[in-house]
């Protein structure tokens, strides 16, 4: 496969050398159909064929990822396996091997770290890099990105890379020419690059936000960038102006290095309620909602924690917390939420009014990930089961694409603060 390469604003300027890069240069490296690509690396006979990595249709599994050949039939991540089998009955199915994916991911991350000290892993198959000339890279970002692309391809998998002045531009650029694409958005061309794109192209705008923007007759990022600040604030609050700045290509974002990631001591989420919670069912639902956010952040950062902390503050101002150590590190919210609900008995009794609740994970295994096969069952509490990890990955994918409200669980419907 030949790499597709574009330098935005200079596609039709044959022989014209773009001016030197000024300011920050952020890249987003995204491995193409990563799980499926690794399976094809280990099974060359599967190359060029529709391949699906996921759970069985018979056991109501879901698709974790699939090859581009399968995507042509309408199969996509987070789809029910039964529907995927109906759309593409000729597909090859595999249950995947997470240890192997971690191994290849580590090789790719090592390449990035060799090119720049500023590498921020977003997930097992995606990372931001700071390749600002003269700061973290010795040459123009185009040459650094080309070299990374070539070095990753030499491992037997491909990646798509977008480069721009900030994370928003880099992320959108990385999706322009998948698979095996390289898109460079030179300084000064950001607004032209973004203007015609639909608002959904920008991360953080899910289905609900997109619908509200449509009601305002805002369909493109260009229209969003021209919307009055007061109008956006009336609908989205303080996030409205941030959305507008991102649509203008003016986001200021810093890439966090791997060393800085390893300094993270805990990942937590807490919320102060407009009205005190007094019913156990409502408190449990709030803890579950907060715990889901923590689990998703752990998976994004490749972290697994071994200590669960539950924190409550009461209406009269005082608060209490409780901790428990798990037998195995995990990023599975089903495991640590269940433990947090057990801890609730230690710090809450009927009649107490809860003003704030928080849940956190700490004591991280910085190797990241679950040290078991992606789709095998493990019975001990703290080691994540395969079906749950499959489901967690699928839910993350749906929420990343359609927003957090796209999928909720029944117990959370009780919590409607």
Q: Where do the protein language model's features map onto the residues?
A:
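DNA-contacting surface of Y-family translesion DNA polymerases
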Residues: 15, 19-20, 201, 209-354, ...
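Short, charged/polar surface micro-motifs in flexible loops or helix N-caps
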Residues: 34, 57-60, 315-319, 364-367
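Short Gly/Ser/Thr- and Asp/Glu-enriched loop/turn motifs at secondary-structure junctions
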Residues: 122-126, 164-167, 303-307, 352-356
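Short, hydrophobic beta-strand segments
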Residues: 127-133, 320-324, 375-379
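Acidic, metal-coordinating catalytic segment for phosphate/diphosphate chemistry
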Residues: 328-417
């Amino acid at each position: 496969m030949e790499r597709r390469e574009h330098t935005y604003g200079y596609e039709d300027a044959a022989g014209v050398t773009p001016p030197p890069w000024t300011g920050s240069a952020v890249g987003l490296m995204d491995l193409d159909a990563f799980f499926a690509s690794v399976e094809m690396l280990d099974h060359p006979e599967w190359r060029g064929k529709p391949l699906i990595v996921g759970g069985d249709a018979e056991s109501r599994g879901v698709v974790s990822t699939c090859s581009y050949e399968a995507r042509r039939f309408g199969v996509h991540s987070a789809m029910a396996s039964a529907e995927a089998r109906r759309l593409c009955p000729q597909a090859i199915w595999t249950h995947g091997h997470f240890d192997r994916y971690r191994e290849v991911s580590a090789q790719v991350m090592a390449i990035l770290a060799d090119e720049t000290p500023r590498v921020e892993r977003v997930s097992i198959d995606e990372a931001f890099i700071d390749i600002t000339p003269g700061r973290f890279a010795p040459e123009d970002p185009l040459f650094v990105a080309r070299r990374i692309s070539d070095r990753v391809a030499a491992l037997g998998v491909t990646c798509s890379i977008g480069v721009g002045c900030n994370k928003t531009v880099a992320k959108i650029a990385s999706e322009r020419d998948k698979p095996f694409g390289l898109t460079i958005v030179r300084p000064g061309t950001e607004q032209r690059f973004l203007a015609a794109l639909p608002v959904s192209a920008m991360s953080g705008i899910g289905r609900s936000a997109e619908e509200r923007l449509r009601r305002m007759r805002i369909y493109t990022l260009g229209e969003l960038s021209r919307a009055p600040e007061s109008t956006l604030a009336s609908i989205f609050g303080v996030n409205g102006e941030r959305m507008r700045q991102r649509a203008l290509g003016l986001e200021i974002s810093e890439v966090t290095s791997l060393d800085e990631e390893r300094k993270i001591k805990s990942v937590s989420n807490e919320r102060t309620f407009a009205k005190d919670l007094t019913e156990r069912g409502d408190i449990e639902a709030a803890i579950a909602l907060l715990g889901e956010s923590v689990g998703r952040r752990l998976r994004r950062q490749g972290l697994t924690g071994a200590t669960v902390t539950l924190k409550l503050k009461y209406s009269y101002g005082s608060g209490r917390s409780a901790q428990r150590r798990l037998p195995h590190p995990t990023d599975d919210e089903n495991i640590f939420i269940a433990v947090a609900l057990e801890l609730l008995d230690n710090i809450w009794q009927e009649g107490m009014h809860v003003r704030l609740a928080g849940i956190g994970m700490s004591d991280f295994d910085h190797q990241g990930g679950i040290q078991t096969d992606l789709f095998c069952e493990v019975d001990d509490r703290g080691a994540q089961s395969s079906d749950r990890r499959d489901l967690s990955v699928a839910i993350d994918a749906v929420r990343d694409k359609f927003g957090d409200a796209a999928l909720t669980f029944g117990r959370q419907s009780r919590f409607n603060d």
